[in-house]
Amino acid sequence: MSNIPAELKYSKEHEWLRKEADGTYTVGITEHAQELLGDMVFVDLPEVGATVSAGDDCAVAESVKAASDIYAPVSGEIVAVNDALSDSPELVNSEPYAGGWIFKIKASDESELESLLDATAYEALLEDE
């Protein structure tokens, strides 16, 4: 079973979301998602300053197996991207919840967080797949 940190929120599309001390949210893909995709070869990052809506595809993770869209779990403004992925996309595989984060977003509507899954619900989703 994949590692599913309890403090994170999850989307049904296998993105995770972590609230930071400054009020922004860090987004990445789950350990389960990176296991399905396999070894990352490239991550197409969103533009800092771009405004996205929840569910918008805003990044792409390319692996040896496939290219997969990464969706914004909440609406808001992209405030940072993980430039380390340009040289080291494999961080998404080795550290999906730490060094392999993809972007940070300033949420424009925090009520959207209510539609995300907690760790227990995400684990149940994986068991149903």
Curated annotation (Swiss-Prot):
**Could you state one GO cellular component term attached to this entry?**
cytosol
Q: Which InterPro entries match?
A: 2-oxoA_DH_lipoyl-BS (IPR003016), Biotin_lipoyl (IPR000089), GCV_H (IPR002930), GCV_H/Fam206 (IPR033753), GCV_H_sub (IPR017453), Single_hybrid_motif (IPR011053)
Lipoyl-binding domain mapped to chain residues: 24-106
Q: Which domain of life is it from?
A: Bacteria
Q: Which residues carry this modification: N6-lipoyllysine?
A: K65
Gene3D superfamilies per the UniProt record, alphabetical: 2.40.50.100
| UniProt GO BP | glycine decarboxylation via glycine cleavage system
Asked if the record carries the keyword Secreted, the reply is: no
The cofactors it requires, by name, are: (R)-lipoate
| SS bond list | none
One Pfam family it belongs to? GCV_H
Q: How is the cofactor bound?
A: Binds 1 lipoyl cofactor covalently.
**NCBIfam families the record matches:** gcvH (TIGR00527), PRK01202.1 (NF002270)
Q: Which family does it belong to?
A: Belongs to the GcvH family.
What binding partners and quaternary form does the record give?
The glycine cleavage system is composed of four proteins: P, T, L and H.
Function comment: The glycine cleavage system catalyzes the degradation of glycine. The H protein shuttles the methylamine group of glycine from the P protein to the T protein.
Q: Report the protein name in the record.
A: Glycine cleavage system H protein
Question: Which organism was this protein described from?
Answer: Escherichia coli O6:H1 (strain CFT073 / ATCC 700928 / UPEC)
